């Protein structure tokens, strides 16, 4: 093992030596010492101290300003080493001994150089200055001639031999070129080589200065001459400069050849040393294999020790478990003792109070008796004195004293009787105190019974108050008022909780807001809503109040819930929740989860189908959040109530079966939603998010259907631009958000004033909410406010808007239920539409083939019979009437109602009657209609090509059957026929284009595709 450790230490020392050599080659490339050099080779390079001085000057330029020649005495070499050691000592670094450099171990020298490298590199990183060190070691120049040695790039003598350079001793007789003149030539500025005299160039050539010059200097001379030739206009160079350039290039080529030869020799040396290291490695492997048995024995002993250690640890764990169990038992006993002590202290305090009262009474009696006894004792003392005086005075008066003794005896008896009476009176006083205590207890019990009566009366008052609130809510529901729930956001971490604008939150929806800038009565304002949630209300508490409203969706009612408030007030927190954990679920997740639970409990009586749409309104554009298409087309909005309840029919509708499906879709929608960072909120919603849940129910027993629609809307926050510090895209988003919220305020104001015209078309948001705000739906609004003082103005404006919303009466909501007969009727109408679409397609194909041979006024069929082109208009008119009757049956009240946007609406008058095909397509794209089958002008005329075909007969039979059923179902309860909307008399006759547009709308429109989604 000892030999292995020694070899390892030797390898480690070799690695450190190679690291120092690599650093020296990078710092002084002219030496180029091989990396696998031994300690002797490194000592040979560093022994004269010249390289050490060059290292100091290279790391800290100017510290030792002196040239060191290749030929110097041993004393000068020792002086160079001492200078290096002095510089290292002044830097506060460990040095080495001169003997180590001469014949000792080189480990100290290697460590010193590594520490010097690390110190200088760390000093350069820290930006420390070396100016004091330079000033301290600045050596004045001497008059001795400088031999161009290592300072000008000359290597040491040993290195000269290895590199094949001529020995400097053979060049002692050559003329020595002064170093200062050499620097003058090599440091000439651009454009001055041509002015260099020939005598100086010849002197430099004959003095052999090019052999001693550094390679970098020679390259700089070449570059300078070439640059000067380029800058000259004619490119002429003097012959002396050309000669100088040739000599410099030859010198560079010679050095490159020498360097290549040196590299080849070094490769041979490296190969031999690599073989030597391989042999050493094999020897080390043999040594390692020999120690395997010892290692196995040590491993066995270690395994036994580990087993004993594991046993000890198990015992220690058992002991710790016993200690923990005893500690728990001790804690339980201590808690029991503490509880008993508390009970004992309570009982002791009660007894002490009673005892103090009794002791006070007894003390008073004792004091009174003590005074009486003292008086008796004083009388006894006086009597004894008198007896003694009488006995001492005269025995003659004994008889007199005997008489007096009898008198005193009687007096003592009377005094004893008096003391006995006092004792009896004390006992009577105690009995009176006991009687008083009993009376006090009776009075306390009577007081408790009276207090209980008061508590019962207060509970009855709260019950009556709750009943009144329930009746008020029922009245509000009958009126169709928008329910308004207010939720106060809690303070964020770091905010001052004392500076709040919310002064009071009542149990019945009262909210008192204080103005921090005003005092007195003017600084407070009271608001009244259906419910106010405090900052400490949980998500479950918020949902429990709106749960009955959401459950009515399964009964066929339309419900709309939207959150309104400024940016950062918690709208998304209320609607979606901060995370997908069940505890933090918002209204969206809880509503869908509740719908699935109820549908599961009713599965024996009803069958429900649930579909989810999720869109957003971003910069007045409707985008589908559940679509995989990134470059989405613009989605349209239906401004009228459709039979299938779809407001945005082109948005993707995803059927869901469980809560997990909803969570996956909501994650996709939240990831696609537009959010951004503002000064008010790090993740601010930059769009209006609309989650629509479509529920279709089927009664298993009677086959009737119900359709409910739940809109869960998370509005973007209203914000002031100066507070949000929005710029660029954020400013544009804020402008669109404020514009849409302003349009919503205009709609609410018009509804509150009951105006005939309600501006729903001013914004995409109000178009989506038209079906909810326009009546026939249960609507609820969450108002989110910030309690901090800085948001006071936004809070007041938000609450004023909510107060205006709470006064809007929408009318009683209606259930969208359809009987079994109506369902069959709708299915027959859908099949009839499909038949007409197929027939029109066939007619269009045949018409294109026969257009050239047909007359403009009549169309000839295959058998030669002719008939008018508009013979198919009867079929289309019946289809139009059927569609109108269908809308009456599915929604009887909406047929007679007047659209708040300016007039009555139905399917037949959605399309303008005075527009051509291009105008209709433009308007349809603006209003959100997606076009169906495109009919040409000849399509209407081609309806008479096959008048006696089987398809016509089947269609006529279906129309007659549907018309009879419509006539039967259109009667009211009193047996009177239902009134239909009168047709305007001044309507212009329909053109073929108008007929084509209406047939396209009725047969191939997006309403047909949307209705089929629920029939799959």
UniProtKB/Swiss-Prot annotation:
GN (gene name): KIN14K
Domain Calponin-homology (CH): 14-121
Region (Disordered), start-end ranges: 123-176, 884-912, 971-1016
Listed InterPro entries: CH_dom, CH_dom_sf, Kinesin-like_fam, Kinesin_motor_dom, Kinesin_motor_dom_sf, P-loop_NTPase
Gene Ontology MF terms: ATP binding; microtubule binding; microtubule motor activity
Coiled-coil stretches noted in the UniProt entry, renumbered to this chain: 288-354, 820-852
Name the record gives this protein: Kinesin-like protein KIN-14K
Family: Belongs to the TRAFAC class myosin-kinesin ATPase superfamily. Kinesin family. KIN-14 subfamily.
Compositionally biased intervals (Polar residues): 884-893, 990-1004
GO CC terms in record: microtubule; microtubule cytoskeleton
Single Gene Ontology BP annotation: microtubule-based process
Claim: ATP-binding is one of the keywords in the record: yes
